UniProtKB/Swiss-Prot annotation:
Its cofactor is Zn(2+). ATP binds at residues 87, 105-109, 524. The lineage of its organism: Bacteria, Pseudomonadati, Pseudomonadota, Alphaproteobacteria, Hyphomicrobiales. Keywords: ATP-binding, Cell inner membrane, Cell membrane, Cytoplasm, Membrane, Metal-binding, Nucleotide-binding, Protein transport, Translocase, Translocation, Transport, Zinc. It comes from Rhodopseudomonas palustris (strain HaA2). Monomer and homodimer. Part of the essential Sec protein translocation apparatus which comprises SecA, SecYEG and auxiliary proteins SecDF-YajC and YidC. It holds the Pfam family SecA_DEAD. This is Protein translocase subunit SecA.
Length: 946
């Protein structure tokens, strides 16, 4: 109460911040006449002037006012668009490294040019992040006209570019690209072996468009570069055949937590099925040998009970393709991890692809936190302001609209069943279509969009493609005639390619568009249709300039007329009179785009995004949600009580309840879900930060190594430290000579480096100390390496040292990632022992990292001591420069130490092998027993270093 009064009296913190920008806005406006008087050449020359001022000691903040005035003038001359005052404020928010919340149609794309230009003056590169390739290409080409006019270069990063093209794009002053491309380029760069092969040049400043989608919705999604493991498709198919045998009483499903678990009866049934199929080892399902089987049973259960076809994924071209729950878009190339994707493939009877091993990974949370300055734009961020600040230290600033919003957001209509709800939606669509009002129906899944499409088809409507000129001609003809044509388009993951065109024409009179969630986000829906879309499409192939000009004028007249029709498509509804009062009155509902939501999403933000498609730039509009007690949100969060209440109220079939209280109750349910999801993301980030800290150490180490011409000091230090650790292990400090494990030390030295070092004889010498023993071993190792340098030459050995060090580091880092994944999966169980899983994970992950570092010293030392260089005149088969190449039979990574040939001898008669002389072994298969007699597989013994 007091807070509300204070806000009314003094204004909110947001109001005060907006007010603080007004002085700079006034200064920019005051410069406008002066800048407008400049010639094109003089305006372009200001870029060099600003750079000179920066070099002389001025800051970017000092240059903000003249730089913004320059960009505004350049936009007027190139695009015919002038930045509004509120857009200048948006640009200032972005420059300060915060989030500008700007409503749909307020020109976020144009706003970004202000902060991009100003920060690009520093010469360190500015990255603009979009949600798909289409928007990246569109915005780079569109806004690139401003940058080019001012003498700045623009690059675009999209799927399918080679490294050379990517390097050129990143070298530009301003680079546009998708979040996926930026993240994967970073991971790929950190798998390169030469600095000149890397494509990115640092992380100075990024502006993230649709920042809520990328930093909130996709925050939990890790970017993973992986390589295939061994093929277990038959195993997945076998496991899948067991699931239909289970009854609902055999497992418990928790939809809120998205988890499923076998009951006691279910376990017994599965045990019997596994035993009969020969897949059960030992006596019980929960014996240690069956841990993997239990995991895959659980994944198969999840695939069948928690994941729905056409909602969570679709099947296309013999593949299971994930559907983004927030946008309804296909996530081509993305796969669920830990065997879940294979379980879905087995469920749908498509080809089961091999599981993958993680080679490199990072979450969007950690990738974007690497930038020195991060900013974002979106139409809906206020509901997630706490999360943006807690995780990214980004403040959300709500930018006022240029014109007041005149959209009417009506209360929800709640029906008892889905059938009643769909009937009400159909009736509402028909009423709107009769008055030529365009309608956008938002659905939460492909399945729901197709249910509505079927309903329209059964009621005399025809489905067309708004991206197809023939379909659009029918829509335009009906609009010109002022008669509804009963045509509709569907926009979901199945029709992703035509997304922008379908959305752009959703504002044509009589258009009915069914869209999953926020598909088509980033493309404005303009009342009457899109001039930018129609002109290129309808003038293509017209060569005569006069004919072309006439066509353009006709399109403009069309759109102006269509806009008037839509603006006047008002709805008159009767308001029931109170008892004893006069007859019913009528009230008008505005025209414009009518948004119909077919159900509430878990997040208020997604609902607000849907509403925000209507009422752009002061246009009228209308939005309403139609709900049923069968909807996921209502069902999961207590629809039983509501159903009882509605029954008691005497709600009849087909009737709806409409009340602000219902809206408030739903909002509270959504807030609970949002809070839970925030906690999940925050907790996951704490765990990922552990791996991220280690990732930074490894990636920084790789960069440092690649910068060095010679790593001889590094490998020498590693060699000496390895020897010190080995001697300390077998010859403890202050121990008596009789307590020394001399035999163990000698065997270990021979096993690792293949040298016969007489440590047993040295140990027998009177008065020898452990320091002397260590010094002699170090001397032998150093002399051995010096001999190799003398034999092959310093340049060759420097190359070998660097290659072996980098590739061994990569190989061990990949193995370490697998270990961390395994640790992460089981660490939660520590909570049952009253121990904090996060602290346990930190401690054990640090221990594993230390082990990896020790293993790195050992492996690099072993390889360099054994390395043989193939002379140039001999044929050599170097593996291609790939990240990985998996053996299809064993699943082993053949690229573990790629591009440094250790020159294995040809296979020899096994009987001629001397266990103590590796040079007599010839080529040994990785799965053979090691010829040294240890009893281990070669790949786990001497082959570990070969």
């Amino acid at each position: 109460m007091i807070g509300a009064f204070a806000r009314k009296l003094f204004g909110s913190s947001n109001d005060r911040r907006i007010k603080a920008y007004q002085a700079r806005v006034a200064a920019i406006n005051a410069l406008e006449p002066e800048v407008a008087a400049l010639s094109d050449e003089a305006l372009r020359a200001r870029t060099d002037e600003f750079r000179a001022q920066l070099a002389a000691g001025k800051t970017l903040d000092d240059l903000l006012v003249p730089a913004f005035a320059t960009v505004r003038e350049a936009a007027k001359r190139t695009l015919g668009q002038r930045h509004f005052d509120v857009q200048l404020i948006g640009g200032m928010v972005l420059h300060e490294g915060d989030i500008a919340e700007m409503k749909t149609g307020e020109g976020k794309t144009l706003v970004a040019t202000l902060a991009c230009y100003l920060n690009a003056l520093a010469g360190k590169g500015v990255h603009v992040v979009t949600v798909n390739d289409y928007l990246a290409s569109r915005d780079a080409g569109w806004m690139g006209q401003i940058y080019s006019f001012l003498g700045m270069s623009t690059g675009v990063i999209v799927h399918g570019l080679d490294d050379g093209q990517r390097q050129k794009a990143y070298a530009c002053d301003i680079t546009y690209g998708t979040n996926n491309e930026y993240g994967f380029d970073y991971l790929r760069d950190n798998m390169k072996y030469r600095l000149e092969d890397m494509v990115q040049r640092g992380h100075f400043f990024a502006i993230v468009d649709e920042v809520d989608s990328i930093l909130i919705d996709e925050a939990r999604t890790p970017l993973i570069i992986s390589g295939p493991l061994d093929d277990r498709s038959e195993f997945y198919n076998t496991i899948d055949t067991f699931i239909p045998s289970l009854d609902k009483s055999d497992y418990d499903v928790d939809e809120k937590q998205r988890s499923v678990a076998l009951t006691e009866a279910g376990m017994e049934k599965i045990e019997t099925l596994l035993r009969d199929a020969g897949q059960l080892k030992g006596e019980s399902l929960y014996d240690v040998e069956n841990v993997s089987v239990v995991h895959h049973i659980n994944q198969a259960l999840r695939a069948h009970t928690l994941f729905q076809r056409d909602k969570d994924y679709i099947v296309r071209n013999d593949e299971v393709v994930i559907i983004d729950e927030f946008t309804g878009r296909m996530m081509q190339g993305r796969r669920y991890s830990e065997g879940l994707h294979q379980a879905l493939e087995a469920k749908e009877h498509v080809t089961v692809q091999p599981e993958n091993q993680t080679l490199a990974s990072i979450t969007f949370q950690n990738y974007f936190r690497m930038y020195g300055k991060l900013a974002g734009m979106t139409g809906t961020a206020a509901t997630e302001a706490d999360e943006f600040y807690d995780i990214y230290k980004l403040e959300v600033v709500e930018i006022p609209t240029n014109l007041p919003i005149s959209r009417l957001d009506e209360d929800d209509e709640v029906y008892r069943t889905q059938a009643e709800k769909y009937a009400a939606i159909l009736a509402e669509v028909e009423r709107a279509n009769k008055r030529m009002q365009p309608v956008l129906v938002g659905t939460a899944s492909i399945e729901k969009s197709e249910v509505l499409a079927d309903l329209l088809l059964k009621n005399g409507y025809k489905q067309i493609d708004f991206g197809d000129p023939k379909g659009l001609d029918k829509l335009y003809a009906a609009a010109r005639a002022g008669k509804p044509a009963k045509l509709f388009a569907v926009l979901n993951a199945r029709f992703h390619e035509q997304e922008a065109y379908i959305v752009a024409e959703a504002g044509v009179p009589g258009a009915i568009t069914i869209a999953t969630n926020m598909a088509g986000r980033g493309t404005d829906i303009k009342l009457g249709g899109s001039l930018e879309m129609r002109i290129p499409q309808e003038t293509a192939g017209i060569t005569d300039e006069a004919e072309k000009a006439a066509k353009v004028e006709q399109i403009k007249a069309d759109i102006e007329r269509f806009r008037d029709i839509v603006l006047n498509a008002e709805d008159e509804i009767e308001i029931e009179p109170a008892k004893g009062s006069k007859p019913a009155k009528t009230a008008k509902r505005p025209g414009g785009l009518y948004i119909i939501g077919s159900e509430r999403h878990e997040s208020r933000r997604i609902d607000n995004q849907l509403r925000g498609r209507s009422g752009r730039q002061g246009d009228p509009g209308r939005s309403k949600f139609f709900l049923s007690l069968d909807d996921d949100l209502m069902r999961i969060f207590g629809s039983g009580k509501l159903d009882t209440m509605l029954t008691r109220l005497g709600l009849k079939e087909g009737e709806a309840i409409i009340h602000p209280w219902i809206n408030k109750a739903l909002e509270k349910a959504q807030q609970k879900v949002e809070a839970r999801n925030f906690d999940i993301r925050k907790n996951l980030l704490k765990f990922d930060d552990v791996q991220n800290d280690q990732r930074k150490v490894i990636f920084d180490q790789r960069i440092d190594l690649m910068k060095e011409d010679s790593v001889v000091e590094t490998v020498t230090d590693m060699r000496h430290t390895y020897i010190e650790d080995l001697v300390a292990k077998h010859v403890p400090e202050h121990a008596y000579a009789e307590q020394w494990d001399v035999a163990g030390l000698k065997d270990e030295l021979h096993r690792v480096v293949g040298l016969e070092i007489p440590v047993d004889e040295w140990a027998k010498e009177e008065g020898i100390a452990d320091e002397e023993l260590l010094a002699r071993i170090v001397k032998v190792f150093d002399e051995h390496m010096a001999a190799k340098v003398a034999q092959w030459g310093p340049d060759v050995m420097r190359y070998a040292e660097k290659s072996i060090l980098l590739q061994t580091l990569d190989h061990l880092w990949r193995e370490h990632l697998v270990m961390l994944d395994h640790l992460r999966q089981v660490i939660g169980l520590r909570g049952y022992g009253q121990r904090d899983p996060l602290q346990e994970y930190k401690s054990e992950a640090f221990g594993l990292f230390q082990e990896m570092s020790a293993h790195l010293r050992e492996a690099v030392t072993a390889q360099l001591m054994r390395v043989e260089i193939i002379p140039p005149d001999q044929p050599q088969e170097l593996p291609p420069m790939e990240v990985h190449k998996m053996d299809p039979n064993t699943g082993e990574d053949e690229m573990a130490f790629a591009n440094v040939s250790l020159a294995p001898a040809d296979s020899v008669d096994k009987s001629a092998r001397d266990p103590n002389r590796p040079e007599t072994w010839g080529k040994v298969g990785r799965n053979e027993d090691c010829p040294c007699g240890s009893g281990k597989k070669y790949k786990h013994c001497h082959g570990r270093y070969a």
